[in-house]
Regions:
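Conserved acidic
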Residues: 2-546
Length: 546
């Protein structure tokens, strides 16, 4: 009926700046005797905020800033910088302390990801005679000439003359429109925060996916365990030495000597950290060399262009040069790491194992039920948004096991997931290669396989055996074409419902900069030219010159 039920103010870093400034404005508006006094109060507030932001402890504990945070604003602030994790877009490591410090990504950098039409920076012109007169009223600047003032007065301490207002407002409005564009382009990301907040009685309006996962996990785990948050939060399990004897599952077995030797070596391995340099082994199966590390399995791929040569509707496939036609399958393990946690009861030592693993299994099953449900709304949340929410929480769990400042920290649990995940995939690769079914590529949660018609039944038999022995579930999708630079950067065309569906990853994804706003904008035209060249037979220069 046109009645306003709430007012929400969207901004970029408004959680740490704009909201505090508005609180100061409303607080001092009736307590100052003149506009000049009010402006001075706001100026001092702004300086306090800016000077404190590099010192996290000071920013959190400052009495004045905390009083502003407690001020009841007449609107709800929504910070898109936080929602898209742009306040922690990258990390730098302190050379002296080794501390990892988050680095924010500014609105201008983000606007490049959006391909915003106008990239603006605004700088005040040099101080002129008219402005110089104003500084004569400031004791420590009185009597200085224009050159001296331009050297001494910081740009944030300048007076704003009337003639500066119009270009400054144009610049400010451009910033506002960029924020509006972020909200317009990513409505589901924004809507999900409202839906989650309402359905689960939490506040995630200013939370990134990772923070949202933390908040929901806290709520879900407390329900499953029967423990209040204060009874389990704030704990972690420290490890000094981690023996793989305590890590490897008993069903991990190999048939070939090379892999048996690898397994024996792993049983004798002890590591003291879980970073990238802590552990690495190479092993060859057939023609493919695989690298095992603390993060996940990778095959050492060479650049390749491959096509399934079996017929597919009216789509042309390259000649098999007289050989037998074959199909490339992508054997993808569903939610691999969370599945290992749930099926094989992997949990931090300080957490209730049954409650933790039952929660993981419940979320996985709930997500499957949601995806296949015919209902538009489930638990008061739109079906697609609920599926996204569950995916966010499920996929975050593994990462939380290795986050030192989190409540799930236990590095042995990390190794149980990653090491066994890799060994499981190697069991599958070995079994397939022993039956002359050749692996094309292997990554953390799946493999690509070349299968001839005569091998179809054997392929299904081996993959079914593998799923039964590991407890994992997987799907085999047909790959029409694979264009790969290496294992992490590729273009894939999948055969689906009589059509071709393109999926790209890494440097060969021309839209990566828009899928993840924290990423840099790195020559997407190159990825587009590669895609057009291989999939549309379009010369590279035609793409570049368009």
């Amino acid at each position: 009926n046109g009645t306003i039920i709430r007012t929400d103010l969207y901004g970029f870093n408004n959680f740490n700046y704009d909201n505090l400034m508005i609180a100061a404005l409303l607080s001092f508006y009736m307590r100052t005797n003149s506009t000049k006094e009010l402006i001075n109060k706001l100026y001092e507030t702004s300086k306090t905020i800016i000077s404190s932001q590099d010192d996290k402890d000071k920013f959190r504990t400052d009495f004045y800033l905390n009083s502003l945070r407690k001020y009841k604003l007449p609107f709800t602030g929504v910070d898109v910088m936080r929602i898209f994790a742009l306040n922690k877009a990258s990390v730098v490591v302190d050379n002296k302390t080794g501390e990892r410090k988050p680095v924010p990504k500014g609105l201008k950098q983000t606007s490049i990801n959006l391909q915003w039409y106008e990239l603006l920076e605004y700088e005040l012109p040099d101080i002129n005679e008219k402005e110089a007169e104003l500084y004569n009223e400031i004791p420590n600047l009185k009597g200085m000439n224009i050159n001296q003032l331009n050297k001494l007065v910081d740009k944030w301490d300048r007076f704003i003359l009337d003639e500066y207002i119009e270009p400054m407002m144009y610049y400010n409005l451009n910033d506002v429109f960029i924020v509006a564009e972020i909200v317009r382009l990513y409505p589901e990301e924004i809507k999900s925060r409202y839906a989650i907040s309402k359905a689960y009685d939490v506040n995630v309006l200013n939370s990134s996916r990772s923070k949202t996962a933390d908040i929901l996990f806290e709520k879900f785990y407390s329900k499953f365990s029967g423990l209040a948050p204060e009874q389990w939060k704030g704990k972690k399990t420290e490890r000094t030495a981690m023996s793989f004897k305590k890590v490897i599952f008993p069903f991990i077995k190999f048939k070939t000597k090379e892999l048996q030797d690898l397994l024996d070596k792993l049983y004798k391995t002890t590591i003291y950290r879980v970073n990238k340099d802590a552990f690495s082994e190479n092993v060859k199966i057939g023609d493919i060399t695989y690298t095992l590390a603390t993060g996940g399995l990778h095959s050492q791929d060479v650049p390749m262009e491959l096509y399934s040569t079996t017929p597919y509707g009216d789509y042309l496939t390259p000649s098999s040069t007289g050989g037998k036609p074959f199909t490339i399958y992508h054997f993808d393990v569903a939610s691999f790491y969370p599945s290992i946690i749930g099926v094989h009861k992997v949990a931090p030592a300080h957490i209730d194992t049954n409650a933790f693993c039952n929660l993981i299994s419940w979320m996985k099953q709930k997500r499957v039920d949601v995806k296949h449900s015919e209902e538009e709304y489930i638990d008061g949340i739109a079906k697609d948004i609920l599926a996204l929410v569950l995916k966010i929480v499920i996929n975050s769990i593994y990462g939380k096991l290795g986050f030192e400042k989190g409540d799930l920290y236990d590095r042995l649990a990390v190794l149980k997931v990653t090491v066994n995940g890799q060994l499981m995939l190697l069991m599958l690769c070995e079994a397939l290669e022993l039956d002359n079914i050749h692996i094309i590529s292997a990554n953390t949660d799946g493999i690509m396989v070349k299968v001839y018609a005569s091998q179809e039944d054997k392929f299904k038999e081996i993959t079914t055996w593998w799923q039964n022995i590991t407890g994992m579930q997987a799907d085999s999708d047909v790959v029409h074409s694979l264009i790969a630079r290496d294992v992490n950067n590729y273009i894939t065309q999948f055969r689906s419902k009589g059509k071709l569906k393109i999926e790209s990853k890494g440097a060969l994804n021309p839209m990566m900069y828009s899928l993840d706003l924290t990423k840099g904008y790195s020559m997407p035209i190159v990825a587009q030219a590669i895609e057009n060249y291989f999939l549309k037979n379009k010369p590279v220069m035609d793409t570049l010159q368009e």
